[in-house]
Amino acid sequence: MLIACGMALFLTSCGAGDAPSFKSEAESTPAEDSIGERLFLDTRFSQYFAAHMTDVNQSLTAGDPVVAQVDTMHGPLPGPFAGQAINCRSCHFVTEFQGVTGAGNRTYSDYTTRSPIPRPMNGFTLTPRNAMHMVGSLQPHTGPTLLHFDGEFATPEDLVKGTLTGRNFGWAPTEAQQAIEQVALVIRKDNGSDQLAQDRTNGLSYSTLFKGTDPKITSDLLIPAADRIDVNTASDQQILDLVAKCISTYMGDLLFQQDELGRYIGSPYDVFLRINHLPVQPNAGETPAQYNRRLLQIVEGLKNPIWVDGSYGAFQYHPFPFQFGATEFAGLKIFLKAATSATDGSQHAGNCAACHLAPNFTDMLFHNTGVAQAEYDSVHGAGAFMNLTVPSLADRNNNFDLYLPASSSHPNASETFRRAPDASHPNYADLGLWNAYLNPDMPNPQTSIKALVCATTQDCSVDQGLGNTIAQFRTPTLRDLEDSSPYLHNGSRATLEDVVRLYIANSQLARQGLLRNAAPELRNMSISDEDVPALAAFLLSLTEDYDDA
């Protein structure tokens, strides 16, 4: 769905031709999207609900404590789902805390470093990582789609199934079948009587919606004939598959503001490009990298740019000005520029666009920018991560329970290398993509991961290839970063300035050969504290008024 929030749509008339004619919701939103939103918000799929319910259509007498409050960087807030059980929205918020100091809108992300899980298991009380924001995560792009910070899921449907039947919903690795049965039970027995069903699907039950033959179903809720199932005769797995498809469709339609041609229009940066008649996206046949180099050449030669100020609009959900001025412009040039034979931080060249390619501001790939090493060394001392013993492929896979993430085949695995560092456990670290690559319990993403690993290294032998995945994490989009703090896969940085300073430190380590498996792009980064304000201002200019209206 094309989300128009906050800023008026005059944006597209600023040097960009006629204003767009948006499709109507009925034309642009498939039925699976609307049904998927309801499923995304449904609180009845978790282990806690299964264990405490009296009837799928009755409220719980006591809610899951995990949703009683929401942890934020500024302290806890009352949970919007208190008295109920966990749902997808419990970690991927949007407008639940709109206008609340220290919280505000989110881009389908949370407010803290790592989210609490409903049921402690395998030593975990929190998720291993920060909740990556979902808006734009399924934006069309070249190359494979790999989801989660470590690429463990090859499709959004796989991600949904893994979530509904996994730890984040309170299910132990040995309880996957029970989780599937709970999803199927809710879908079969739901009668559409709760407020969520009234608001999202006109009070129709899931069984009615999935069958798709009732004349009361409006066109916007009518699932295509090829996808319909009779839940009374379908298998539990078939029901889960359709649930996953609906939620995945909903996820795929979570987009930042765009016009009818898919061009971004919602942020001060987007307005700046348009009013200065700058290219807003690659030309036909032009790669994103080529577009970014061309954009740099143009902005470096731009004379007398027109600045964006309050006359172009105002934020509805943010307390700072809607602006793109000289400081943001300087930050844009630093962001796009790559250093030449960098030996220090003096070139005002961030090389950020090597991974965060405009206009999406992500390459959807995996890189090690030193975040895991910084966290590990903060616990165990400088240089400790460089000396951490990481097993070979044979050693790792032959000792699955010792090293790899828990699964239904290995329910007692310790997940040594998908944990936050701990002073009492010196082997605990998060190695990112290393956990998924060549993992026999994660077969679906292997072809795509191997293609990426072998495309970026000359030596693609199994041990070298595995070594090249150490501490690599998926590149998030930088759009609307203001609404996804705290930042990075571990939520370790609270401000944009803190993130930039971390990259300054890690680029220095990379040039000195002191950053383990460093992304080569870091060596072409040459920035200093002098560049922090401009880069942070530019990143802030990617903010827009996102909501889920």
Question: Could you tell me what each predicted segment is?
Answer:
Residues 1-12:
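Bacterial N-terminal signal peptides
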Residues 14-549:
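Periplasmic c-type cytochrome electron-transfer domains
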